[in-house]
From Swiss-Prot:
Gene from which this protein is expressed: CPVL
Keywords: Carboxypeptidase, Glycoprotein, Hydrolase, Protease, Signal, Zymogen
Naturally occurring in which organism (per UniProt): Pongo abelii
GO terms, biological process: proteolysis
PROSITE patterns in the record: CARBOXYPEPT_SER_SER
Signal peptide start-end: 1-22
Glycosylated residues in this chain: N81, N132, N307, N346
Superkingdom to which the source organism belongs: Eukaryota
One GO molecular-function entry: serine-type carboxypeptidase activity
Protein's UniProt keywords contain Hydrolase: yes
Function: May be involved in the digestion of phagocytosed particles in the lysosome, participation in an inflammatory protease cascade, and trimming of peptides for antigen presentation.
Family under the similarity heading: Belongs to the peptidase S10 family.
Protein name listed in UniProt: Probable serine carboxypeptidase CPVL
The keyword Iron is annotated on this UniProt entry: no
Length: 476
């Protein structure tokens, strides 16, 4: 069945036409207050599950056609903590090709506090929002071949919300527990997908979320009656191991010409102090140093990086500012007809600031042990855009070289492979290092928001990885 499906995928590809405001700031986070007009009522699906009215809840979650959207999808809220009334918002798109067999892929945005609606509308969902608030079809949507589940995570992100401050996550264990509750409910509403292969994916700060939820699934599957069919994970430009990344910032920024010798020395000194605090588990102090030096998330003044480079964008070192069209989606989500269709009503679209404040101490902590566990047991894809600054390819590779997993020695000796999509291509798509089920990919011409800049390369990469078709070019 998979072989047949892959032939369809390749045929489809052959027929197709050929802010970053920072890791933690406002590129993904445009606050959308409740709009004027009839936005309908929020749909909470947990009561339907508990009452045994699953089919009714499923029918209500169907997204009605609006503004040109005609692809079947489902959306609503899943309650993950009744005590605090904590709810996660999801939007699910069954694959356009053979959804009954296609893998289910969970997408988590970074931040912390960035909505996965950014991934949906800016990166790889079926539609792109235009400047006049209409939709156009995306050329290479991941929803063609994969059933994509977008969740606003953690609680307090995007449309997800809680009624109590105790409902906010303060560490990755909290994040994983809420996600796990949502996933179990999701597969109750859509039981026909529970045996499909399941992958957890995400980018940036989701380099923590992805290993966290994968670790919890791995731990609970042997002892729970309801099991999630986890097959692997994919992390793009992931902030999984802050210490190894922070230590390389100064030299990297110097080598790409954004810092001079004097600035590099100051940057290195600050990074060294940050790492010292990390090693002493002074998490808050480490966060403050990094925030003032580079991120500028919770400070009132521009960061040192912004002052000396004059640039706010460190998702792509060829651009100084963020593309305007990456912000259209937030305005689109404020339209009453959109809110009514996706069943969020007048709920505020949160900017993520509160989420980040509660996760400040988590920011500089590593999830390397969990990532190692997943690398030892599942398929793993770690990818980077060539032009990224905040989680540069070289910094990710440095982190990987320091990991101790079953393939670590072989990985250190492995040769990098040139990856082209088609044999006739004059351009190289990227570079791959593969050891067993572990794949490290660097995408040429890509930035932190990879599918936005390189949609075809991102589409080809994720399908090669999930469907296990290797990295040899297609004939065509």
């Amino acid at each position: 069945m998979v072989g047949t499906m892959w032939k369809v995928i390749v045929s489809l590809v052959l027929l197709m036409p050929g802010s970053c405001d920072g890791l933690f700031r406002s590129l993904y986070r445009s606050v959308s207050m409740p709009p004027k007009g009839d936005s309908g009522q929020p749909l909470f699906l947990t009561p339907y599950i508990e009452a045994g009215k699953i089919q009714k809840g499923r029918e209500l979650s169907l997204v009605s056609p609006f503004l040109g959207l005609n692809m079947r999808s489902y959306a609503g809220f899943l309650t993950v903590n009744k005590t605090y009334n904590s709810n996660l918002f999801f939007w699910f798109f069954p694959a356009q090709i053979q959804p009954e067999d296609a893998p289910v892929v969970l997408w988590l945005q970074g931040g912390p506090g960035f909505s996965s609606m950014f991934g949906l509308f800016v990166e790889h969902g079926p539609y792109v929002v235009t400047s006049n608030m209409t939709l156009r079809d995306r050329d290479f949507p991941w929803t063609t071949t994969l059933s994509m589940l977008y969740i606003d995570n953690p609680v307090g992100t995007g449309f997800s919300f809680t009624d109590d401050t105790h409902g906010y996550a303060v560490n990755e264990d909290d994040v994983a527990q809420d996600l796990y509750s949502a996933l179990i409910q999701f597969f109750q509403i859509f039981p026909e997908y529970k045996n499909n292969d399941f992958y957890v994916t995400g980018e940036s700060y989701a380099g923590k979320y992805v290993p966290a939820i994968a670790h919890l699934i791995h731990s609970l599957n042997p002892v729970r009656e309801v099991k999630i069919n986890l097959k692997g994970i994919a992390i793009g430009d992931g902030y999984s191991d802050p210490e190894s990344i922070i230590g390389g910032y100064a030299e990297f920024l110097y080598q790409i010409g954004l810092l001079d010798e004097k600035q590099k020395k100051y940057f290195q000194k600050q990074c060294h102090e940050c790492i010292e605090h990390i090693r002493k588990q002074n998490w808050f102090q480490a966060f403050e140093i990094l925030d003032k030096l580079l991120d500028g998330d919770l400070t009132s003044d521009p960061s040192y990086f912004q002052n000396v480079t004059g640039c706010s964008n460190y998702c792509n070192f060829l651009r100084c500012t963020e593309p305007e069209d990456q912000l259209y989606y937030a305005k689109f989500l404020s339209l009453p007809e959109v809110r009514q269709a996706i069943h969020v009503g007048n709920r505020t679209f949160n900017d993520g600031t509160t989420v980040e404040k509660y996760l400040r101490e988590d920011t500089v902590q590593s999830v390397k042990p969990w990532l190692t566990e997943i690398m030892n047991n599942y398929k793993v894809l770690i990818y980077n855009g060539q032009l990224d600054i905040i989680v540069a390819a070289a910094l990710t590779e440095h982190s990987l070289m320091g990991m101790d997993w079953k393939g670590s020695q072989e990985y250190k000796k492995a040769e990098k492979k040139v990856w082209k999509i088609f044999k006739s291509d004059s351009e190289v798509a990227g570079y791959v290092r593969q050891v067993g089920d572990f794949h490290q990919v660097i995408i040429r011409g890509g930035g932190h928001i990879l599918p936005y800049i390189q949609p075809l390369r991102a589409f080809d990469m994720i399908n090669r990885f999930i469907y296990g078709k290797g990295w040899d070019p297609y004939v065509g």
